[in-house]
Amino acid sequence: MKELPDYFVQVPEAFALVEEGVYRCSGVLSAEQIKYLDTLHLKTVLILSVEGPSRALSQYMKTTGIRRMHLGMTRWQSNLGWKPVSEELIKDALECVLDKSNHPLLVVCSSGVRETGTLVGCLRKLQHWNFNSIVYEYRSFAGGKGKYTQELFIELFDTDLVTLPPSLPEWFVEEQRMWAQEQQQRFSELYAMPVDSQG
């Protein structure tokens, strides 16, 4: 790939840091946007759409030796009813995102919104985010491309389907520890309340 001057570097469309070592963006990337990816020192690209990545991204992964995981192709299902994506795709993608050995990792789909937004929303649910905060983040990226069925999918997604990998990232471990501590504190406060004997 021809080396571009630094002033030709562009941030990919729908790009963001999800958590430390996890990024997201559209899978349709130009040569100028590919140069930006160099700064991330990626180990894995997780492709969630059925369509393959852009030619520029495919070439970049090939020349740099970045691991390509095309779950969108292997987990595609034709008859999902109302669901915008399959539960199997989101479950497997979450397990990949939560496996620290895949980091730094970039999550892409053709738009950077549909599958990627749904995956990030389900990750936030695993992180115990408030549902309003999840929807706010989803809509911030989706803009006019957002769909109610994706929000509904996130709300109804069963996080118990996800098998946590043995090498979890520190940010996830710390969030789970804090969540358990808060739950323990709420439980203690609930049972420490005096009982109203005049009831």
Give the location of each predicted region.
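Cys-dependent protein tyrosine phosphatase-like superfamily
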Residues: 1-107, 111, 118-199
